[in-house]
Regions:
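Charged docking surfaces used in two-component/phosphorelay signaling
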Residues: 5-13
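Short, glycine/charged-rich "phosphate-handling" switch motifs in NTP-dependent
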Residues: 90
């Protein structure tokens, strides 16, 4: 799956509530104003503030430090996974996202 609308539809059909943000700054504001968010899916390529910067900013906030973050990225070159994990991702999935793989990762991180 490549786009946010397809991804949101799959998750909503499985009973999940999906909140979306168009930029890294919006994502941080959304997380700060919605304390019951259980997990974040983070695109690396975003305007204003990319996913790496956004994850660093999230991890600097004590109330969000333990929030599971799954990085979703078309960047699948050698070293990209490590860069995502170093920036604060809990998990890394390359696009196009395999639905079963994403659901498995969500189950893993939501049930910790």
């Amino acid at each position: 799956m490549r786009n946010i609308f397809a991804l949101s539809s799959v998750l909503e059909r499985r009973g999940m509530t999906v909140l979306t943000a168009g930029t890294g700054r919006q994502a941080i504001e959304l997380l700060e104003s919605t304390p019951d968010v259980a997990i974040a899916l983070m695109d690396i390529m975003m305007p204003e503030m990319d996913g790496y910067e956004t994850m660093h900013a999230i991890r600097r906030q004590s109330q969000l430090r333990r929030l599971p973050i799954i990085a979703l990225t078309a960047k699948a070159m050698k070293g990209d996974r490590e860069k995502c994990l170093e920036a604060g991702a809990s998990e890394y999935l390359a696009k196009p996202v395999n639905t079963d793989q994403l659901l498995s990762a969500l189950r893993t991180w939501l049930h910790r």
